[in-house]
C-alpha cells in the first residue's frame, strides 16, 4: 500500500473487526506494562524504613497507585507500613501485578483472534451487507458499562461494602492506612482533600453514566444532529475520545501537583506548596508551643516531634527542587535519609533566639541570614567579611540541637555554627547516606513531579490531536474538495479538478 508512517492507521478505518483488534492489543500493552513495571519496582523496593525511605523517596511509580486502592501486603512477607505478615492473600502487590500480566496475555490472544477473524456478521449492516458500526448505540453501551464500573467502585470498593476501602490519612500524612470511607453528600464532598467526596462523586457520576447510557441506547439522535456532528464517522469517535482523555489528564495533573485526597503525601510525597507555605514547619512549631505551655523543656517537646513530620519539613522532599530531566529517584540525589539529627536553635551572645531564613523553592543558592522573632536581621554568613557587621563571629552565635540524634548537643565555634546554619536553610537537618547509591548530591523530583509533567505534556499534545481530528471529521468534504451541494453525477478521474468540466483530462 505504501502508506507513510503517519497514515498507517487508515488500514482500520473501514474495518470494524481489525479496529477492535488493535484496541484490544493496545489494552494488552498497557496492562502488560503495568504488571511488568510493578514486578520491577517490587524487585528493587526496600520496605524496611517506611518513615525515612518511603516509596516516593525510592522513585516508585506504580506501587503508590496500588496502595491507594487498598493493596498493602506483599508475598515477600512485608507490609507497606513496616510490619510483617504471614498470609498476604491473592490481592497482594505481586497478585495484582500477576493479574495484569495474565490479563495482558489474554488480550494479546484475543487481539490476534480478532485480526484473523475480522469479517464477522455482527459488523455487517443487514441492509447493505457492508461492514458498518452503529456508533451512537456503541456509545450508549460504553457509557452504560463505564457508569456501572464507576458506581460499583464508589458504592462498594471505596465504602468497604465489598472491598478494602482506600488509603486515608490525616492532614500531615502521619497516620495513613487503608480504611472504608463513607460518602460525603454535603458541601464538604466538594473539598478535594475530603476522602468522602471520592465515594459520593463516583456514586453520583456512575448513576448519571448509567442513566445517560440507557438514554443513548433507547433514543436515536435526530438526523440533523447526526449529520451535523458527523456521528457516522469513526474519526468523530476518535476526536471526542481524545477530548475525554486530555481533559482527564489535565485534571489529574492538577490534583497530583496541588495535592488532593486522591494523592496522599505518604504515597506520592509532599507538594511544593507545603514547603512554600511552611505547612509542616507551622505544625511542628504549634506542637512545640503547646508542649512549652505545659511547662515541658525544649528537649522534651522536640523529642516528641514525630520523625516522619520532621522529614516532610525538608527541602529535599520538595518535588519542585529536582530538575525535570534529572534521572533517578530522590535517594539518588541527596542520598538515603538515615536519621534526624535534631532541630537547631540559634542564639546570639545576648541570648536572643535567631531563625535561619529558609531557601525558596527555585533557588539553588541562598544567603545564610539569621533573623530574630520580629524579622530583624541579627546575623549572617557574609560574602565579604571585611565589610560585615553581623557575621557569626562578631555576633557570637551559638547553636543547640533538640530532638533527634544530637538532642542537647550545643556548639559555639563559628565554623560548626555556620555549618548548621547552612543546613537549616534546607529545613530540618537529617543525616543522609550518599555512599550506598553513589548519590550525587543534586536534588531529584518525586513521582509526583514526574506524573504531573508527563500528564500535562500529553494532555497538551492530545488537545491538539482533538482539534486536528475534530477539524478533519467536521470539514471532511471541504478537505476532500467535494462541493456538498453538488447533485450532478461526477465521474472520478475524468477531470483534473473534481466536478469542474473545464478541466477535462486529455486522452493520451
From Swiss-Prot:
Looking at the UniProt entry, the stretches that span the membrane are 21-36, 101-115, 140-156, 203-218, 237-252, 457-472
Q: Which GO terms describe its cellular component?
A: chloroplast thylakoid membrane; photosystem II
Report the co-factor binding details.
Binds multiple chlorophylls. PSII binds additional chlorophylls, carotenoids and specific lipids.
- The UniProt entry lists the main location of this chain as plastid
Compartments it resides in? Plastid, Chloroplast thylakoid membrane
Q: Does the keyword Membrane apply?
A: yes
**Which domain of life does the UniProt lineage start with?**
Eukaryota
Q: Which UniProt keywords apply?
A: Chlorophyll, Chloroplast, Chromophore, Membrane, Photosynthesis, Photosystem II, Plastid, Thylakoid, Transmembrane, Transmembrane helix
The protein's matches in HAMAP family, at most eight in alphabetical order, are given as:
PSII_PsbB_CP47
Q: Which family does it belong to?
A: Belongs to the PsbB/PsbC family. PsbB subfamily.
Q: How does it assemble?
A: PSII is composed of 1 copy each of membrane proteins PsbA, PsbB, PsbC, PsbD, PsbE, PsbF, PsbH, PsbI, PsbJ, PsbK, PsbL, PsbM, PsbT, PsbX, PsbY, PsbZ, Psb30/Ycf12, at least 3 peripheral proteins of the oxygen-evolving complex and a large number of cofactors. It forms dimeric complexes.
This chain's protein is named Photosystem II CP47 reaction center protein
Amino acid at each position: 500500500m505504501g502508506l507513510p508512517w503517519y497514515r498507517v492507521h487508515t488500514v482500520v478505518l473501514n474495518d470494524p473487526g481489525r479496529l477492535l483488534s488493535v484496541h484490544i492489543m493496545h489494552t494488552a500493552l498497557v496492562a502488560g506494562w503495568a504488571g511488568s513495571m510493578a514486578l520491577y519496582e517490587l524487585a528493587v523496593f526496600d520496605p524496611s524504613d517506611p518513615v525515612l525511605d518511603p516509596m516516593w523517596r525510592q522513585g516508585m511509580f506504580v506501587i503508590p497507585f496500588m496502595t491507594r486502592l487498598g493493596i498493602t501486603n506483599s508475598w515477600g512477607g512485608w507490609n507497606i507500613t513496616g510490619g510483617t505478615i504471614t498470609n498476604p492473600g491473592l490481592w497482594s502487590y505481586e497478585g495484582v501485578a500477576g493479574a495484569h500480566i495474565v490479563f495482558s496475555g489474554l488480550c494479546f490472544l484475543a487481539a490476534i483472534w480478532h485480526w484473523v477473524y475480522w469479517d464477522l456478521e455482527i459488523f455487517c449492516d443487514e441492509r447493505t451487507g457492508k461492514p458498518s458500526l452503529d456508533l451512537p448505540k456503541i456509545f450508549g453501551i460504553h457509557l452504560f458499562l463505564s457508569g456501572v464500573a464507576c458506581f460499583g467502585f464508589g458504592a462498594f470498593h471505596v465504602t468497604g461494602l465489598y472491598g478494602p476501602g482506600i488509603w486515608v490519612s490525616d492532614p500531615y500524612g502521619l497516620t495513613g492506612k487503608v480504611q472504608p470511607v463513607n460518602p460525603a453528600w454535603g458541601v464538604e464532598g466538594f473539598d478535594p482533600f475530603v476522602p468522602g467526596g471520592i465515594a459520593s462523586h463516583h456514586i453520583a457520576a456512575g448513576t448519571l453514566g448509567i442513566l445517560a447510557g440507557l438514554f443513548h441506547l433507547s433514543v436515536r439522535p435526530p438526523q440533523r444532529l447526526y449529520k451535523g456532528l458527523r456521528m457516522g464517522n469513526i474519526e468523530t469517535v476518535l476526536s471526542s475520545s481524545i477530548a475525554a482523555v486530555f481533559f482527564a489528564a489535565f485534571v489529574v495533573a492538577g490534583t497530583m501537583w496541588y495535592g488532593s485526597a486522591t494523592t496522599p503525601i505518604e504515597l506520592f510525597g509532599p507538594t511544593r506548596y507545603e514547603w512554600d507555605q511552611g505547612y509542616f514547619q507551622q505544625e511542628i512549631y504549634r506542637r512545640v508551643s503547646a508542649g512549652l505551655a505545659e511547662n515541658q523543656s525544649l528537649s522534651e517537646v522536640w523529642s516528641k516531634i514525630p520523625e516522619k513530620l520532621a522529614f516532610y519539613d525538608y527541602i529535599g522532599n520538595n518535588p519542585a527542587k529536582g530538575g525535570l530531566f534529572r534521572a533517578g529517584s530522590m535517594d539518588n540525589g541527596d542520598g538515603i535519609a538515615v536519621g534526624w539529627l535534631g532541630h537547631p536553635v540559634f542564639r546570639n551572645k545576648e541570648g536572643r533566639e535567631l531563625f535561619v531564613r529558609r531557601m525558596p523553592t527555585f533557588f539553588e543558592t541562598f544567603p545564610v541570614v539569621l533573623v530574630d522573632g520580629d524579622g530583624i536581621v541579627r546575623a549572617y554568613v557574609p560574602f565579604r567579611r571585611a565589610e560585615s557587621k553581623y557575621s557569626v563571629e562578631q555576633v557570637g552565635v551559638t547553636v543547640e540541637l533538640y530532638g533527634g540524634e544530637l538532642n542537647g548537643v550545643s556548639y559555639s565555634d563559628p565554623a560548626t555554627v555556620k555549618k548548621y546554619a547552612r543546613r537549616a536553610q534546607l529545613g530540618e537537618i537529617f543525616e543522609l547516606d550518599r555512599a550506598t547509591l553513589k548519590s550525587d548530591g543534586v536534588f531529584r523530583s518525586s513521582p509526583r513531579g514526574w506524573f504531573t509533567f508527563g500528564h500535562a505534556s500529553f494532555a497538551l499534545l492530545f488537545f491538539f490531536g482533538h482539534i486536528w481530528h475534530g477539524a478533519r471529521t467536521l470539514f471532511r468534504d471541504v478537505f476532500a474538495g467535494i462541493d456538498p451541494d453538488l447533485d450532478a453525477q461526477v465521474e472520478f478521474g475524468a477531470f483534473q479538478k473534481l466536478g469542474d468540466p473545464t478541466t477535462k483530462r486529455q486522452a493520451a
